[in-house]
């Protein structure tokens, strides 16, 4: 590792291909079957730490040396100091290797990359956050930022609807429990099928959304989840009065290089990694139907 070329934040524009070295500070199992883990990373270069700035919705490329790299949405909030968190589902070569690492191991990170959630548009409005399963990662970043960014009074109601197949597949359990105790956010957790001991909602996310979401008169919605969940939730949002310009989502599949060079995430005139990953449904309606 000692001969690895180190990228500092000052070199970002000159050479976006070089990763910054990050040390794994903490690893947390997020679900009962241990297939999803959160990695809290700390900067090894103080200048990198000083200059690194990101917003909810952005992503980074994480690299395991000798194995490859892959894009991951940032799960921490800019308001959380001392670490950058990524939640990783074990699926392929890079993610499997990440899951085998331990605190103290070193990996690479490029970023932050892409755009972010429309925080300016959310000011003065109710914010509805709808998530399903593993796709709750960048939504956690958004929620923590709205609550802890020092401007909670700039937003209206914050309503979070989060669903998974079983209780054991709901991530960020400590966060969810803490949010439920607050009076400035409404958290609705739901699972697909009732199980013994579960006292919260039972039902699919689209149905729970119809029961819970506010009127669309002064609201912005952010939806992230499996494609089938989004597909059945969108008609519900339309029924509630939400226009396409009021609904945002994040596209992360197909991205590879993160900087618009490989062309893998190209859709019509857009590159998901450059023009996104956050898009309004109005923007997506103008694109070819690849997504």
Regions found by a protein language model. Give the residues of each.
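Ferredoxin-reductase
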Residues: 6-105, 164-166
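Short microdomains enriched in Cys/His and/or Lys/Arg
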Residues: 130, 279-291
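Non-catalytic, surface-exposed connector residues within folded enzymatic/regulatory domains
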Residues: 18, 51-54, 154, 170, ...
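Local cysteine-cluster metal-coordination motifs and their immediate loop/turn environment
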Residues: 228, 252-277
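FNR/FR-type flavoprotein reductase catalytic core
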Residues: 2, 93-256
